[in-house]
Regions:
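Bacterial N-terminal signal peptides that target proteins for export
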Residues: 2-14
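C-terminal capping alpha-helices of c-type cytochrome domains
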Residues: 17, 73, 82, 91-111
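N-terminal signal peptide c-region/cleavage motif recognized by signal peptidases
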Residues: 23-25
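Gly/Gly-Pro-rich "capping" loops immediately C-terminal to redox-active cysteine motifs
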Residues: 33-36, 51-79, 88-92
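The canonical Cys-X-X-Cys-His
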Residues: 41-49, 102
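Detector for the c-type heme attachment site
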Residues: 46-52, 107-108
Length: 111
């Protein structure tokens, strides 16, 4: 008798836990995506939305460039080995993990 009562109330809490777990995982992924998009948005003033510039043909597009190349260039700007009007200062504001994330994000964008 006690086992039947236990078996009756057990499924609803398990379902609730499963739903909460799935929601938490989705929320964490959404937060990660939002954080990455916010980080990439800092590039939009010059390089355009999603890395496709429209206003200044002298500014290179970032969409679709290889991640390895972007990492190398950002680190060169950061170290002062590559010069540009503002990129040397801007690159200093990113840590290596953020540079890697930005490079992967823009590499995944269609040209």
């Amino acid at each position: 008798m006690k086992l039947r009562r236990f078996a009756r109330w057990l499924p609803p809490p398990l379902v609730a836990l499963a739903i909460l777990g799935a929601a938490a995982a989705a929320s964490a992924q959404d937060a990660k995506t939002l954080n990455l998009r916010s980080l990439a948005a800092t590039c939009a003033n010059c390089h355009g939305t999603a890395g496709r510039p429209v206003a200044n043909p002298a500014v290179p597009g970032l969409a679709g460039i290889p991640a390895v190349y972007m990492v190398e260039q950002m680190k060169a700007f950061k170290a002062g080995a590559r010069t540009a009007t503002v990129m040397q200062q801007l690159a200093k504001g990113y840590n290596d993990a953020q540079i890697d994330q930005l490079a992967a994000y823009f590499a995944a964008q269609p040209k």
